[in-house]
């Protein structure tokens, strides 16, 4: 016999979490639990405002429709809504025990630009010293100076940068101007520096700073292929879709000689632990981009190892659907 439950969570965020144009005050999402006999599986459905094509309410309607079929014994195709497809495919994979349990809890720490603070964090990191810096929120020149300071201060540091398509070509050049050419090879990649792919390609060609595709991966005309200056693709499963789709993208990236990075869309601790398992399975040689839990004030159902944040249990969540 099959049963399914859909829970809704809302976790307060730390002050100062800004998406593209708005402050994120709480992270809201759905958790799905599938039960079949003695086996169960969980998944998270949490569209990210400003980044997901669907709203949480739309995701809930689609999830309820899929679950109604599932409890009746009907196997439906993946939802066309990426967050729903991802959450339901995780729940199914756990139920069928096809999502490996081993996890990669390494994370590229999100860095605010203070070298002393980052130095302390990196000293405690095992192995590869990789950190991520969000650029494009302030002046491009300031970003360039900060990146340069970090690379100079920490000789074994590699940086991943993310601009979210926020720069014109002129601003991107302003950033590059302040990064010493001798240090640029330690920028693993800069995600989508410019507003268009063509400008980003030209930027990589002219500056020698490698780029990665992020937003582009979710666009209908995108194809994974080797290109000069392109080092990686960033895969955010909540925005991309099912586990099968993520697996396909990773395989295509590796065939093209590109790095594939599994990355967070600010999921709860439950979703993050599943992303850590996905990364250990599909991209074991690459540090995933999962350092977002500390943006929240609580964990949900499943804890992240060694996190001091309080844990919200299943009993504390609201049930929005059950059959």
From Swiss-Prot:
Coiled-coil ranges per UniProt: none
Pathway info: Quinol/quinone metabolism; 1,4-dihydroxy-2-naphthoate biosynthesis; 1,4-dihydroxy-2-naphthoate from chorismate: step 4/7; Quinol/quinone metabolism; menaquinone biosynthesis
Catalytic activity: (1R,6R)-6-hydroxy-2-succinyl-cyclohexa-2,4-diene-1-carboxylate = 2-succinylbenzoate + H2O
Cofactor: a divalent metal cation
GO molecular function: magnesium ion binding; O-succinylbenzoate synthase activity
Pfam families for the chain: MenC_N (PF21508), MR_MLE_C (PF13378)
Enzyme Commission number(s) from the entry: 4.2.1.113
GO biological process, one term: menaquinone biosynthetic process
This protein's UniProt keywords: Lyase, Magnesium, Menaquinone biosynthesis, Metal-binding
Amino acids binding Mg(2+): 162, 191, 214
Root EC class: lyase
Top-level taxonomic group: Bacteria
Active site: 134 (proton donor), 236 (proton acceptor)
NCBIfam families assigned to the protein according to its UniProt record, in alphabetical order: menC_gam_Gplu, PRK05105.1
Biological role: Converts 2-succinyl-6-hydroxy-2,4-cyclohexadiene-1-carboxylate (SHCHC) to 2-succinylbenzoate (OSB).
Family: Belongs to the mandelate racemase/muconate lactonizing enzyme family. MenC type 1 subfamily.
Protein name, per record: o-succinylbenzoate synthase
């Amino acid at each position: 016999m099959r049963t399914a439950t859909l829970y809704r969570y809302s976790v307060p965020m730390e002050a100062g979490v800004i998406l593209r144009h708005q402050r994120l005050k709480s992270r809201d999402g759905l958790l799905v639990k599938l039960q079949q006999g003695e086996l169960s599986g969980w998944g998270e459905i949490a569209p990210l405002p400003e980044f997901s094509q669907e709203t949480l309410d739309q995701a809930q309607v689609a999830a309820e429709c899929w679950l109604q079929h599932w409890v009746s014994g009907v196997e439906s195709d993946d939802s066309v809504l990426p967050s729903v497809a991802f959450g339901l495919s995780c729940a199914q994979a756990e139920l069928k025990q096809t999502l490996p349990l081993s996890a990669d809890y390494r994370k590229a720490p999100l860095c605010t630009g203070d070298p002393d603070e980052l130095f302390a964090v990196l000293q405690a990191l095992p192995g590869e010293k990789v950190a991520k810096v969000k650029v494009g929120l302030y002046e491009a020149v300031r970003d360039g100076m900060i990146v340069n300071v970090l690379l100079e201060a920490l000789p074994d540091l590699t940086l991943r940068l993310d601009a979210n398509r926020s720069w014109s070509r002129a601003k991107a050049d302003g950033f590059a101007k302040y990064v010493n050419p001798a240090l640029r090879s330690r920028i693993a990649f800069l995600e989508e520096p410019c507003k268009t792919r063509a400008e980003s390609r030209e930027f990589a060609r002219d500056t020698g700073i490698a780029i990665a595709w992020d937003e582009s991966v979710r666009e209908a005309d995108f194809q994974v292929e080797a290109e000069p200056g392109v080092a990686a693709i960033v895969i955010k499963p909540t925005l991309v879709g099912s586990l099968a789709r993520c697996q396909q993208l990773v395989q295509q990236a590796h065939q093209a000689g590109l790095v594939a990075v599994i990355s967070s869309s600010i999921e709860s601790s439950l979703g993050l632990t599943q992303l850590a398992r996905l990364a250990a399975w599909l991209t074991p040689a690459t540090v995933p981009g999962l350092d977002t839990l500390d943006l929240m004030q609580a964990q949900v159902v499943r804890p992240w190892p060694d996190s001091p944040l309080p844990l919200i249990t299943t009993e504390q969540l609201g049930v929005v659907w059950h059959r």
